[in-house]
């Protein structure tokens, strides 16, 4: 006798197997150069670096204000930045699985949204605890966007047979210049 839970578990296993198969087929197509590349793919991968570069630069410029606003010393600020790094490392550990299940584009968009939203929340926080929690989520956005954008860049570079990685990372730097820019 099959229970409802067994049936839903089987359906989930079938869905995961299908997703894994399609991702593996896509990887084989990329490796055998059976996939064409468009300028939209290249621009999308560039944007995947530009946007995180922008909000990371905004964060860097915001650190002195945050320190003064919360009246904290370097030790507390260092601990808060450590929490940001922990969020980033944890998200990098699962980024490959997320990309495998949902694709680079969706993961980069989600990560950019998480990064920008959490940075906006950091600016509104008035306590150390809430700011630290928001920085943890900011780290998640930074880590996810970095790992998934680099994976997309690698795939795009392999298909196009051009050396694009320097240009993509240049996009991160351009985002860093554009982020804190004010007229």
Task: Please give the residue ranges for each predicted region.
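Paired small-residue
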Residues: 129-137
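Primarily marks hydrophobic transmembrane alpha-helices of the MFS/SLC 12-helix fold
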Residues: 105-108
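Helix-to-loop junctions at the C-terminal end of transmembrane segments
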Residues: 91-103
């Amino acid at each position: 006798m099959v229970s409802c839970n067994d049936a839903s578990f089987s359906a989930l296993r079938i869905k995961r197997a299908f997703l894994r198969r399609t991702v593996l087929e896509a990887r084989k197509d990329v490796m055998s150069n059976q996939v064409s590349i468009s300028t939209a793919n290249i621009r999308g991968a560039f944007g995947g670096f530009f946007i995180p570069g922008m909000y990371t630069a905004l964060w860097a410029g915001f650190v002195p204000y945050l320190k003064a606003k919360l009246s904290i010393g370097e030790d507390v600020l260092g601990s808060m930045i450590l929490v940001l790094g922990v969020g980033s490392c944890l998200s990098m550990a699962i980024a490959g699985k997320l990309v495998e299940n949902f694709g680079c584009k969706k993961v980069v968009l989600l990560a950019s949204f998480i990064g920008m939203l959490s940075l906006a929340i950091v600016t509104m926080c008035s306590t150390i605890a809430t700011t630290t929690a928001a920085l943890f989520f900011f780290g998640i956005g930074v880590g996810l966007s970095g790992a998934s954008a680099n994976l997309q860049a690698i795939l795009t570079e392999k298909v196009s047979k051009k050396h694009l990685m320097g240009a993509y990372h240049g996009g991160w730097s351009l985002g860093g210049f554009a982020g804190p820019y004010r007229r």
